[in-house]
Amino acid sequence: MMELLKLNIVTPQGSIFSGDVKSVTLPGAEGEFGVLPGHADLLSLLNAGAIEFEKSNGKTELVAVNWGQVKVDAVSVDVLADGAIAIGGDSESEVAMAIANARTLLEEATDNNVAISSVVSRIESAAKNSL
Protein backbone atom coordinates (compact mmCIF):
# COMPACT_ATOMS: atom_id res chain seq x y z
CA MET A 1 0.00 0.00 0.00
CA MET A 2 1.22 3.46 -0.90
CA GLU A 3 2.13 5.76 1.99
CA LEU A 4 0.30 9.09 2.01
CA LEU A 5 0.33 12.32 3.99
CA LYS A 6 -2.76 14.15 5.20
CA LEU A 7 -2.49 17.76 3.93
CA ASN A 8 -4.61 20.55 5.41
CA ILE A 9 -4.37 24.13 4.11
CA VAL A 10 -6.45 26.56 6.16
CA THR A 11 -6.92 30.35 6.13
CA PRO A 12 -9.00 32.58 8.40
CA GLN A 13 -11.70 32.35 5.69
CA GLY A 14 -11.82 28.54 5.82
CA SER A 15 -10.30 25.39 4.38
CA ILE A 16 -8.56 25.60 1.00
CA PHE A 17 -7.59 21.93 0.75
CA SER A 18 -7.85 18.84 2.91
CA GLY A 19 -6.89 15.45 1.58
CA ASP A 20 -4.33 12.70 1.12
CA VAL A 21 -1.20 13.49 -0.88
CA LYS A 22 1.97 11.70 -1.95
CA SER A 23 4.25 14.72 -1.44
CA VAL A 24 4.21 18.44 -0.66
CA THR A 25 6.65 21.22 -1.59
CA LEU A 26 6.44 24.37 0.53
CA PRO A 27 7.92 27.91 0.29
CA GLY A 28 9.72 27.93 3.66
CA ALA A 29 11.25 31.06 5.17
CA GLU A 30 14.71 29.48 4.74
CA GLY A 31 13.96 28.20 1.24
CA GLU A 32 11.70 25.75 -0.54
CA PHE A 33 11.49 22.28 1.00
CA GLY A 34 9.74 19.02 0.25
CA VAL A 35 7.87 16.67 2.56
CA LEU A 36 7.26 12.95 2.06
CA PRO A 37 5.55 10.43 4.37
CA GLY A 38 7.74 9.70 7.38
CA HIS A 39 9.24 13.22 7.51
CA ALA A 40 10.73 14.39 10.80
CA ASP A 41 8.68 16.78 12.94
CA LEU A 42 9.13 20.38 11.82
CA LEU A 43 7.68 23.84 12.37
CA SER A 44 8.45 26.55 9.80
CA LEU A 45 7.35 29.97 8.69
CA LEU A 46 6.18 30.20 5.08
CA ASN A 47 7.06 32.98 2.67
CA ALA A 48 4.91 34.17 -0.20
CA GLY A 49 4.99 31.47 -2.85
CA ALA A 50 3.34 28.31 -4.08
CA ILE A 51 2.55 25.11 -2.24
CA GLU A 52 2.75 22.25 -4.72
CA PHE A 53 1.36 18.83 -3.88
CA GLU A 54 0.84 15.54 -5.64
CA LYS A 55 -2.53 14.02 -4.85
CA SER A 56 -3.01 10.29 -4.34
CA ASN A 57 -4.30 10.01 -7.94
CA GLY A 58 -1.00 11.44 -9.26
CA LYS A 59 -2.42 14.85 -10.19
CA THR A 60 -0.29 17.84 -9.14
CA GLU A 61 -1.99 20.95 -7.77
CA LEU A 62 -0.79 24.34 -6.57
CA VAL A 63 -1.99 26.79 -3.94
CA ALA A 64 -0.53 30.31 -3.78
CA VAL A 65 0.03 31.63 -0.24
CA ASN A 66 1.03 35.06 0.99
CA TRP A 67 2.59 33.89 4.27
CA GLY A 68 1.89 31.50 7.07
CA GLN A 69 3.14 28.66 9.21
CA VAL A 70 3.41 24.93 8.69
CA LYS A 71 3.55 22.02 11.12
CA VAL A 72 4.92 18.77 9.70
CA ASP A 73 5.01 15.32 11.26
CA ALA A 74 5.43 11.80 9.88
CA VAL A 75 1.82 11.51 8.67
CA SER A 76 0.49 15.06 8.21
CA VAL A 77 1.22 18.58 7.00
CA ASP A 78 -0.89 21.39 8.48
CA VAL A 79 -0.62 24.81 6.84
CA LEU A 80 -2.06 27.91 8.48
CA ALA A 81 -1.91 30.69 5.87
CA ASP A 82 -3.00 34.30 6.12
CA GLY A 83 -4.25 34.13 2.54
CA ALA A 84 -4.32 31.39 -0.08
CA ILE A 85 -5.66 30.86 -3.60
CA ALA A 86 -6.14 27.37 -5.08
CA ILE A 87 -4.99 27.36 -8.69
CA GLY A 88 -7.45 25.48 -10.81
CA GLY A 89 -10.88 25.39 -12.32
CA ASP A 90 -13.00 23.65 -14.90
CA SER A 91 -12.45 26.22 -17.64
CA GLU A 92 -9.69 28.45 -18.96
CA SER A 93 -11.50 31.52 -17.63
CA GLU A 94 -11.70 30.08 -14.10
CA VAL A 95 -7.99 29.21 -14.19
CA ALA A 96 -7.12 32.69 -15.53
CA MET A 97 -9.14 34.26 -12.69
CA ALA A 98 -7.34 32.10 -10.11
CA ILE A 99 -3.95 33.10 -11.55
CA ALA A 100 -4.90 36.80 -11.46
CA ASN A 101 -6.07 36.45 -7.85
CA ALA A 102 -2.85 34.63 -6.94
CA ARG A 103 -0.74 37.39 -8.53
CA THR A 104 -2.64 40.02 -6.50
CA LEU A 105 -2.20 38.00 -3.30
CA LEU A 106 1.55 37.69 -3.89
CA GLU A 107 1.98 41.36 -4.87
CA GLU A 108 0.30 42.40 -1.62
CA ALA A 109 2.63 40.11 0.37
CA THR A 110 6.01 41.08 -1.06
CA ASP A 111 7.69 43.71 -3.18
CA ASN A 112 10.21 41.20 -4.56
CA ASN A 113 9.22 41.29 -8.24
CA VAL A 114 11.62 38.49 -9.17
CA ALA A 115 10.03 36.14 -6.62
CA ILE A 116 6.52 37.11 -7.74
CA SER A 117 7.37 36.53 -11.42
CA SER A 118 8.97 33.18 -10.63
CA VAL A 119 5.95 31.93 -8.67
CA VAL A 120 3.42 33.25 -11.19
CA SER A 121 5.36 31.62 -14.05
CA ARG A 122 5.35 28.30 -12.18
CA ILE A 123 1.62 28.64 -11.48
CA GLU A 124 0.82 29.48 -15.11
CA SER A 125 2.86 26.52 -16.35
CA ALA A 126 1.13 24.11 -13.95
CA ALA A 127 -2.29 25.53 -14.84
CA LYS A 128 -1.68 24.99 -18.57
CA ASN A 129 -0.71 21.39 -17.90
CA SER A 130 -3.88 20.79 -15.88
CA LEU A 131 -6.28 21.84 -18.66
UniProtKB/Swiss-Prot annotation:
InterPro entries: ATP_synth_F1_dsu/esu, ATP_synth_F1_dsu/esu_N, ATPsynth_dsu/esu_N. Its main location: membrane. GO terms for cellular component: plasma membrane; proton-transporting ATP synthase complex. Keywords: ATP synthesis, Cell inner membrane, Cell membrane, CF(1), Hydrogen ion transport, Ion transport, Membrane, Transport. CDD domains: F1-ATPase_delta (cd12152). Coiled coil: none annotated. It is a peripheral membrane protein. It comes from the Bacteria. It holds the Pfam family ATP-synt_DE_N. GO terms for molecular function: ATP binding; proton-transporting ATP synthase activity, rotational mechanism. Belongs to the ATPase epsilon chain family. HAMAP family: ATP_synth_epsil_bac. F-type ATPases have 2 components, CF(1) - the catalytic core - and CF(0) - the membrane proton channel. CF(1) has five subunits: alpha(3), beta(3), gamma(1), delta(1), epsilon(1). CF(0) has three main subunits: a, b and c. Produces ATP from ADP in the presence of a proton gradient across the membrane. This is ATP synthase epsilon chain. The lineage of its organism: Bacteria, Pseudomonadati, Campylobacterota, Epsilonproteobacteria, Campylobacterales. The gene is atpC.
